Amino acid sequence: HARAKWLGPMPKKGDSCMTKRATCAVAEKSGARAYNSAMLIGPNGLIAVYRKAHLFSDEKNLFSKGNTPFEVHDIGGVRIGMMICFDWFFPEAARTLALKGADIICHPSNLVLPYCPAAMLTRCLENRVFAITANRIGTEERVKGKPLKFIGQSQIAAPDGKVLYRASEAKEEARVITIDVEKARNKNLNELNNIFKDRRPELYKG
């Protein structure tokens, strides 16, 4: 998956809550298996690993299906969940993280389909969470004769479905955005509708 580039030194003790935490995607080897994984890293090292649940296209020939649940981790009072790339196509991924209390969904990606930037706005709106999608730019030919072109457009999206920042399609960018996580904890749309309390899971079974 995407190679991780450090934007600065590794986190160290004494750093503020979110300034020295990092999420990156890696190819993880575990025994005889390989997983498309995301790591959450903090001042004391590795916090958590999530293994991609939904493999896309030729990834099925390279990686095993992820066997870790969608979990939420408290980082200095901010609740972080992770999903990877094509996981966005399955609404259950973001909904599970939201139901477990995520304020922010970290979403490292190698997106080649054009739909995700707009779709993630819906994921944020329907779950009232923030989402940070970090995507690649450029091209790569993993399988001979089948080049991949990445769409760029890394973005930060808000619980109201609005784009706080979206990067370009063709150049590397870094941006710092200040958010209020309390907006992700208010699940009320109006005086009468709460998106979680109004759920009818008894009617949703397939």
Over which residues does each language-model region extend?
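Active-site catalytic loop in hydrolytic enzyme cores
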Residues: 29-100, 109, 115-122, 150, ...
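Short, surface-exposed linear segments at secondary-structure transitions and domain or protein termini
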Residues: 56-62, 173-176, 180-185
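Short helix-loop capping/hinge motifs at secondary-structure junctions, enriched
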Residues: 45-48, 162-164, 184-185
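CN hydrolase (nitrilase-like) catalytic-core segments centered on the catalytic cysteine
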Residues: 3-18, 89-175
